[in-house]
């Protein structure tokens, strides 16, 4: 999930319900229906249109894509200036993987090349990190520019602290993009950069207090960055999958893989410790102390991604889909948080992807919901509502739960829809249903 911005800086439901409840075994994939096929075509077209829009006249070379691009349609709230021209790393990683699923390797590599350059040539700290966001467009400079804007009235440069920070999950997703690209077309720079990103998380976010794992990353301006001391189930799942994949890739090339194997085990062990067997669901992670498990909240992605990624031992977790159905259902789709206040398009697409992986198909109602969110510019709205909440804070300076999604066309939502509709698993680089093991009923 990408965090958009700081508020301070600024009759089908039953069918879908039956599809989620009680899933215990993977089924052979069924043939996609007409809606799913159309959604695959249209979401892939939306991603290609995003590339064409943001590249300007540069038809080759590294490229970052804008995360939120208003369609200026009725029902869209006023756009937040802090998001104008911001290319969130998570959204771009997803878009690159989805472009691979759409058969557009050349466009996917342009995003991967931008990530490689960003890691090698950070604006101030070339230590192997990526920032949470960059300036969208062709990357023509040696050091990719960070987002921001000139405020003529104040006569000062305005930037966003979250956007220039480094969240652990975003680092892992950048690595997953490069691993998908390397698998599609072996490229030494992609694998080497993925290893460097994972090394950064080991050196900078490993936290052995409480349940051993990886904390949230680093937040703030370069001269005053501080650790995000909480640990996230989702972030650790991302690291576990990226590290395990990297270990396999370097081992295949005859290189030592012990570091990545250890990292994968550490992160996956953390995910396993967040499983609540009595409630049959995952906790979202820990509190700020990095040790106390946060038991109240529930994040949709934290429930779904372990099932889509399907690491060894994941059969014990399949019943979390019952929790999702009971506590994340919103209309024909699903919301971000427990007892949600609206549909989260991206998360609803994640549910579709998980159903395709675990059951071989997702319900028609869900595909139709996703299709209904297409904006005039080809991207898909982050939510059908004007605004939905997540129950989470953006950073340590937040005074409350200030992380929201708004009804703006969103690159990340579009990418997840493309992944779900094409049946492509971003955690493995393969067709989802062919990779997920069957589980005993």
Model-derived features with residue positions:
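Bacterial N-terminal signal peptides that target proteins for export
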Residues: 2-14
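Bacterial N-terminal signal peptides
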Residues: 12-22
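Low-complexity, Ser/Thr/Pro/Gly-enriched N-terminal "stalk/linker" regions
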Residues: 27-164, 169, 188-191, 195-225, ...
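Well-ordered alpha-helical scaffold segments within catalytic/enzyme domains
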Residues: 31-33, 91-107, 173-187, 238-255, ...
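Alpha-helical positions within canonical tetratricopeptide repeat
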Residues: 106-110, 189, 193, 256-259, ...
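Loop-centered beta-sheet repeat module
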Residues: 227-281
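Long, repeat-rich segments with strong aromatic
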Residues: 292-361
């Amino acid at each position: 999930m990408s965090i958009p911005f700081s508020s301070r800086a600024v009759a089908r439901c039953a069918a879908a319900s039956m599809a989620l409840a009680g899933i215990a075994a993977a089924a052979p994939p069924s043939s996609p229906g007409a809606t799913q096929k159309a959604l695959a075509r249209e979401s892939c077209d939306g991603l290609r249109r995003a590339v064409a829009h943001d590249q300007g006249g540069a038809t080759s070379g590294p490229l970052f894509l804008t995360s939120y691009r208003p369609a200026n349609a009725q029902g869209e709230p006023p756009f937040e200036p802090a998001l104008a021209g911001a290319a969130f790393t998570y959204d771009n990683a997803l878009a690159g993987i989805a472009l691979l699923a759409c058969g557009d390797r050349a466009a996917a590599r342009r995003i991967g090349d931008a990530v490689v350059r960003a890691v090698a040539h950070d604006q101030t700290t070339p230590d192997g990190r990526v920032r949470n966001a960059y300036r969208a467009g062709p990357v023509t400079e040696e050091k990719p520019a960070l987002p921001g804007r000139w405020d003529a009235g104040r006569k000062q440069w305005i930037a966003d602290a979250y956007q220039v920070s480094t969240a652990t999950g975003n680092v892992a997703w950048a690595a997953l993009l490069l691993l998908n690209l390397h698998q599609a077309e072996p490229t030494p720079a992609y694998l080497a950069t993925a290893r460097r990103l994972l090394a950064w998380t080991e050196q900078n976010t490993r936290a052995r207090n409480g349940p051993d794992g990886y904390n949230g990353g680093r937040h703030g301006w370069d001269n005053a960055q501080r650790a995000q001391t909480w640990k996230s189930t989702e972030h650790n799942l991302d690291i576990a999958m990226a590290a395990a994949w990297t270990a396999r890739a370097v081992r295949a090339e005859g290189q030592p893989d012990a570091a990545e194997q250890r990292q994968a085990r550490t992160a996956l062990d953390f995910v396993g410790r967040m499983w609540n067997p009595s409630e049959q669901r995952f906790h979202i992670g820990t509190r700020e102390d990095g040790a106390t498990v946060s038991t109240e909240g529930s994040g949709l992605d934290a429930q779904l991604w372990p099932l889509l990624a399907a690491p060894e031992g994941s059969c014990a977790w399949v019943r979390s889909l019952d929790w999702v159905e009971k506590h994340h259902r919103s209309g024909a789709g699903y919301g971000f948080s427990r007892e949600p206040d609206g549909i989260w398009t991206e998360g609803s697409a994640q549910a579709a992807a998980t159903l395709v992986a675990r059951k071989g198909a997702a319900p028609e109602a869900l595909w139709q919901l996703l299709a209904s969110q297409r904006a005039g510019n080809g991207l898909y709205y982050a939510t059908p509502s004007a605004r939905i909440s997540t129950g989470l804070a953006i950073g340590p300076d937040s005074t409350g739960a200030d992380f929201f999604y708004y009804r703006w066309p969103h690159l990340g939502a579009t990418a997840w829809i493309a992944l779900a509709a094409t049946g492509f698993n971003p955690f493995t680089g393969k067709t989802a249903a062919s990779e997920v093991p069957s589980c005993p009923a």
